Amino acid sequence: MKLGWVGFHMEGIPALEAVLEAGAPVVAVLTLKPEVAASRSGAADYRPLCRRFGVPLHEVTSINDPESRTLLQGLGLDLVFVIGWSQILAPETLASARLGMIGAHASLLPKNRGSAPINWVLIRGEHITGNSLIWLANAVDAGDVIDQTELPITPYDTCATLYERVAASNRDMIMRVLPRLLRGEHPGRPQPRSEGAVLPRRRPADGLIDWNQEACAVYNMIRALTKPYPGAFGWLDGRRWTVWQAALLPGAAGATAGLAPGEVLGPVISPDESACGQVVACRSAAVTLLQVEADDGTLLRGRQLAEQDWAGKSWDHG
């Protein structure tokens, strides 16, 4: 049995490490070239792990280009894991592994098929998500389900904390099924039919904050798009600021009667610098900005952020 691995995102690292530690016959890992990975959110360096286990690492521009397809065919792989890879694989690429290719999608399929499921569930304020290990098929996220893990979402989660749990569940699900796969078995069950819409792709420009939303929606947007993603953003005093961290002030705690959405109420001051920030009114209630960064790299947090003379100023959409 000859196994291959395709991945560039950090969510694939724990699973690959566990598979290699188990002594599975991984003969090649494919990842993105550094100059391509540099523009992708959540990209991880697979070189140290491959060096540690002596596994050949191949850097590609696209998994579907002729060079990558020739490489895969030449490797003569029986089974390929595609974990932490955002590109849809072409039918010809999928056909290059004798037994098929296995991927993971960060939702409880068939719900939330499509792009950026982690970001979308946080933006929508959902309380439960999950991860699905599937056989890759020509249709997007439509292959047979091998295993699933349910993951609760708390109000304190961000895209980063959710991705940590997704990465751990990738590892756990793969290790549960690996012995069967190495015996040549093909476990899985068809997905139920779903009429739900496929989640659309997200782009950096989609992170523009709409202060006319409820405070909870603004808070959800910020935690959904924080690092390793490009971040939610807005304009104040003619400068574009990315909001990396915020706190929600619901109900009476964030009362904003008579204030326009986007108006800065003033600072939060505390001996605990991590609690310092600036309070901004939303359509109802408010959020406290805890960490912001200007386009020129100026990072404000703690006391430095609280001491900005922003009270009475308003965030706008540029």
Which positions does each model-derived feature cover?
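Low-complexity, glycine/alanine/valine/leucine- and proline-rich hydrophobic stretches
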Residues: 250-290
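A short, sequence-level motif marking secondary-structure junctions
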Residues: 244-251, 291-297
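One-carbon transfer enzymes
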Residues: 1-233, 239, 274, 281-318
